Amino acid sequence: MEALRQRIETAFENRQHITPGTVEPSLRADVETVIAMLDKGEARVAEKINGQWQVHQWLKKAVLLSFRIFDNGVIDGGDTKYFDKVPQKFADYDEARFKAEAIRVVPPATVRKGSFIGKNTVLMPSYVNLGAYVDEGTMVDTWATVGSCAQIGKNVHLSGGVGIGGVLEPLQAGPTIIEDNCFIGARSEIVEGVVVEEGSVISMGVYIGQSTRIFDRETGEVHYGRVPAGSVVVSGNLPSACGKYSLYAAIIVKKVDAKTRAKVGINELLRIVD
């Protein structure tokens, strides 16, 4: 693995000279190996080690190299055709393989090769980009988007129209991460490498990037780039220092533990008690 990493790092430094016509066969094979590892979940762009998220930048670089190495080709989409560099993940699946992996895919859900989909997941008509990791028991609802290299935990619900940002366009340092047992409400956007920690509930229409103030109304703390574990978050605003206007903010209205979350419905958690 270390030798593979070093070869990818070296190639990435010289990427401006790489094209589908000039790429060395050995580099093509290396990138294909990485894409296959990501596709099977044998490697992931970020993983939690000793309680901290570690980003494996070289895997992200391999994904970026793939766009320089592979040429566009025709992809059969049944009633239509597509022309792209990245094949579809399920292009060679049959009934037995879908059953073995316990994945339900509702048309016209699109999942690019190089993304991992865990067991007992449900993909409604949605989009999962390459390098993404979607863990087991997760629901990706209609028109939700899981961006490149995003990390989605176990038993997560991404509601209709949710956008989870990617790292490739524009290039970001770290992927957006939704930890286990989170609920992301309809049409919310979590982007720019924000981490939503375990057991959090995000209401409908909440937008969080690295510059978004995440205000805890109980403690007065302001967080950036991280939603603390067990937070219940709604959209709101905070007054300016001069008091003449207010600016958008995400508001933590309460904290819940796993026991409370198991007993109480999502809608009940989102009711604000003044």
Swiss-Prot record:
Catalytic activity entry: (S)-2,3,4,5-tetrahydrodipicolinate + succinyl-CoA + H2O = (S)-2-succinylamino-6-oxoheptanedioate + CoA
GO molecular function: 2,3,4,5-tetrahydropyridine-2,6-dicarboxylate N-succinyltransferase activity; nucleotidyltransferase activity
Enzyme Commission designation: 2.3.1.117
Binding site for substrate: 104, 141
Pathway where this protein functions: Amino-acid biosynthesis; L-lysine biosynthesis via DAP pathway; LL-2,6-diaminopimelate from (S)-tetrahydrodipicolinate (succinylase route): step 1/3
Top-level EC class as recorded in UniProt: transferase
ATP-binding among keywords: no
Compartment(s) where it occurs, according to its Swiss-Prot or TrEMBL record: Cytoplasm
UniProtKB keywords: Acyltransferase, Amino-acid biosynthesis, Cytoplasm, Diaminopimelate biosynthesis, Lysine biosynthesis, Repeat, Transferase
InterPro entries reported in the protein's UniProt record: DapD_Trfase_Hexpep_rpt_fam, Hexapep, Hexapep_transf_CS, THP_succinylTrfase_dom1, THP_succinylTrfase_N_sf, Trimer_LpxA-like_sf
Pfam family, one: Hexapep_2
Any one Gene Ontology cellular component term annotated for this protein: cytoplasm
Domain of life the protein comes from: Bacteria
UniProt record similarity statement: Belongs to the transferase hexapeptide repeat family.
Subunit description: Homotrimer.
The protein's name in its UniProt record: 2,3,4,5-tetrahydropyridine-2,6-dicarboxylate N-succinyltransferase
Gene symbol of the encoding locus: dapD
